[in-house]
Amino acid sequence: MIKYYAPIAEVYDFLGKFITKGMKVLELGPGVLPFPYATHFCGWLDSEREKLSNYKVVDFSKDKFPYEDKEFDFVYARHVLEDLYNPFNCIEEMSRVAKAGFIECPSPLTEVCRESENWKDEKYEFKWRGYNHHHYFVWNDGQLNFLHKFPVVEHMKINQEDYILELLKDKYHWNTYYLWKDNIKYKHHEHPRDYFAPGNDEYAQLIVKGVNSSIVFTGNFKKKMLKMESERS
């Protein structure tokens, strides 16, 4: 199966339309491919100081970010929130320090399909569902939704064939996209308030809801990008 790990160039171009010269732009967790429009960076690796200027070390799950309220015009966070034990501290801090921003996480489609992560090792017979180090399913239905990814998902009966076809058909379905202004709207689906137990029908239905919502809203995001591109050409 074709994999889309690197940022999609068209998404970069789209985000560039919201960023003008002179803006202060913060990237969270820059990794090996820093956001080209970023002027400031923060992350949990102290070693990044050597490669990036304006870099500060932050524990996203618990720290207050070392910036003033609404200091930044734009904040960019790609493949960060799903890795955190407490992404909600990070969300609140992004809303506090920035006026607008963009969040990208792996989509629920990738998190339920086997071979999304350890596909490179052909000798390894067992393939995890999605990425085994991720703590949350994340999807957009007008707000960001977070559902804890329990190990029981490996044993659930999920027909992934249709989901794989979606991933093969359109590279955009590999990710969840969320563009925001003023503050980030989100919902944490919690046990036992929103589902009785991990692995039961309510939990499974939330996963299916996340997958279906992701397909719809990713399609809308792509249409918005294409519309803006056609209006400017």
Which residues does each predicted region cover?
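Conserved SAM-binding loop
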Residues: 14-113
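Class I SAM-dependent methyltransferase Rossmann-like catalytic core
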Residues: 1-19
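Intrinsically disordered, low-complexity segments enriched in polar/charged residues with Gly/Pro
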Residues: 4, 52-53, 123-126
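S-adenosyl-L-methionine-dependent methyltransferase catalytic module, highlighting the catalytic core
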Residues: 88-96, 100-233
